């Protein structure tokens, strides 16, 4: 007889680990299946840091979810003793009419979020590491900062295990089908049944959700670490903010203070400037010309940052055509399958609240959280 569960969760990265935690916290009998080992670096939930912010330039509709996610950061830290968020402040820099600045200001204004607007002179005075041009401004948000992806995943796995979830690593799902009043899931090792299936596939969405009708694009991204020219002191969190910086051509970069000691530098990356790939074909080698392009770009806006190149790492974005998430009951299987995917390079800060939403959907079929923006049916006929 197949082992039977209330819910099977496919994928135990950021979203899946949070889903396993929230489901098991509510008493559900949970099985989690993961292709790789725990807290791996093959997908989208690694790299030491991810930006978190509330003045959200992508759309004001995200703000209520961010406010809840911030509450859950604290709950996770209290429950596990792991640091998952460092809120040391952040700036959104660009021309006043740039998406980064204008969109952030729109969300801050609509939701009455604490913020300050800084002109170029004030940016340079407050943050001497930054060198904006005279026509650039910044929205400063005190509650912006970073989340630590590996710690976040480890914390949610810890909580799920503590609450009785059964987590199987290096056991990927090979296929699933509807079965009686639920689902049947196959792996190379076994066959399992459950009343509900949750699929959090990350970059494997095009392979695992072919019947969803969403044209996902998987994009290779590169993260870089540099030793600043004059050491990391000026780049410590008390001196140097997280930032998203949009230039006159609309190119965005994002970066972090130095958080891991004097020898590990500071991290920076381009936002959505990668090449299309698959999890099987991604080039995980970072080439000299890529490092040079990053250093050249940063030498204009943060001149002291690109001193000595230390290391680089790759990850993958799973993009939707409109760059908004997919979180919903599966339209083709609305009674038994919940999906959370297509986070388009800006999802990790939402991990705790997405876990809560997924648990709502899987156990009750609905959620009080505002997720209308994330219905996959909006994309069913969209071009990739």
Swiss-Prot record:
It is found in: Cytoplasm. This is Monomeric sarcosine oxidase. InterPro entries: 3-OH-isobutyrate_DH-rel_CS, FAD-dep_OxRdtase, FAD/NAD-bd_sf, MTOX, SoxA_mon. Its main location: cytoplasm. Belongs to the MSOX/MTOX family. MSOX subfamily. GO terms for molecular function: flavin adenine dinucleotide binding; sarcosine oxidase activity. Its cofactor is FAD. Binds 1 FAD per subunit. Monomer. It is an enzyme of class 1 (oxidoreductase).
């Amino acid at each position: 007889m197949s082992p039977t569960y209330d819910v099977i969760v496919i994928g135990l990265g950021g979203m899946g680990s949070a889903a396993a935690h929230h489901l098991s916290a509510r008493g559900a009998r949970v099985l989690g299946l993961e292709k790789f080992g725990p807290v791996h670096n093959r997908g989208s939930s690694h790299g030491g840091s991810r930006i978190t912010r509330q003045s959200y330039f992508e759309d004001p509709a995200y703000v209520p979810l961010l406010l809840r996610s911030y509450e859950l950061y604290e709950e996770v830290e209290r429950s596990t003793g792991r640091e998952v968020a460092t809120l040391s402040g952040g700036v959104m820099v660009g021309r006043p009419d740039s998406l980064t600045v204008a969109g952030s200001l729109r969300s801050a204004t609509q939701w009455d979020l604490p913020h300050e607007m800084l002109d170029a002179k004030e940016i340079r005075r407050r943050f001497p590491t930054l060198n904006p041009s005279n026509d650039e401004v910044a929205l400063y948000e005190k509650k912006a900062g970073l989340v630590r992806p590996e710690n976040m995943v480890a914390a949610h796995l810890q909580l799920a295990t503590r609450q009785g979830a059964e987590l199987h690593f290096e056991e990927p799902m090979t296929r699933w089908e509807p079965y009686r009043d639920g689902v049947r899931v196959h792996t190379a090792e076994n066959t399992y049944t459950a009343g509900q299936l949750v699929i959090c596939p990350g970059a494997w969405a095009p392979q695992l959700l072919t019947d969803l009708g969403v044209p996902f694009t998987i994009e290779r991204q590169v993260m870089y670490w540099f030793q600043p020219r004059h050491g990391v002191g000026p780049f410590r969190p008390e001196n140097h903010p997280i930032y998203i910086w949009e230039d006159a051509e609309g190119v965005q970069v994002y970066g972090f203070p130095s958080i891991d000691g004097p020898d590990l530098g500071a991290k920076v990356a381009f936002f959505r400037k990668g090449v299309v790939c698959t999890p099987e074909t991604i080039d995980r080698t970072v080439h000299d010309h890529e490092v040079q392009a990053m250093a050249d770009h940063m030498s204009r806006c943060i001149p002291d940052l690109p001193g000595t190149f230390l290391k680089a790492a790759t990850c993958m974005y799973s993009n939707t055509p409109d760059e908004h998430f997919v979180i919903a009951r599966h339209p083709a299987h609305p009674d038994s399958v919940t999906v959370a995917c297509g986070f388009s390079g800006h999802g990790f800060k939402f991990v705790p609240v997405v876990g809560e939403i997924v648990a709502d959907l899987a156990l009750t079929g609905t959620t009080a959280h505002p997720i209308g923006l994330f219905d996959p049916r909006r994309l069913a006929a969209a071009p990739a």
